[in-house]
């Protein structure tokens, strides 16, 4: 009975994971191959897509370079957001009001995972800060206070 159960589990895993693997290939991206653009949501920062398209279904990865002391007003996303600090220091706070006193410092290697629709804000430390954001799209950004949305200015 145990052998039969083991065989059935192995077959089930093989059958359910095969479609996910079909059509996929590995991806290697070097930092010099990234195309940096001026994102309308973060004026003064730079953004590069590493993989996928955040506005469409599926995995996405992008990087954002923030100048020293850059502030991101309270906002939220319809998908989970996962952020890793690659260089500099990044601060993250939770809530609908920008409050540096309640933020958490994330040094290089620091990570934060933010659930969908969870209000949060962020800022860079005293030097240029590079973060990598990944998740499963589609996602977006909605500023808590519409007046903070740079796309509307």
Please annotate each region the language model reported.
Residues 1-4:
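Positively charged n-region of N-terminal signal peptides that target proteins for export
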Residues 72-74, 92-93, 114, 119-125:
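Short beta-strand His + acidic residue motifs that chelate non-heme Fe in jelly-roll/DSBH
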Residues 67-70, 76-97:
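Glycine- and acidic-residue-biased ligand/ion/polar-headgroup-sensing regions
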Residues 6-15:
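Bacterial N-terminal signal peptides
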Residues 50, 109, 131:
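Divalent metal-coordination and catalytic microenvironments
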Residues 25-27, 101, 121-153:
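Double-stranded beta-helix
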Residues 19-60, 146-153:
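A short, N-terminal "cap"/entry segment at the start of jelly-roll beta-barrel domains
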Residues 53-55, 67, 90, 96-117:
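Short acidic-glycine-tyrosine-enriched beta hairpin
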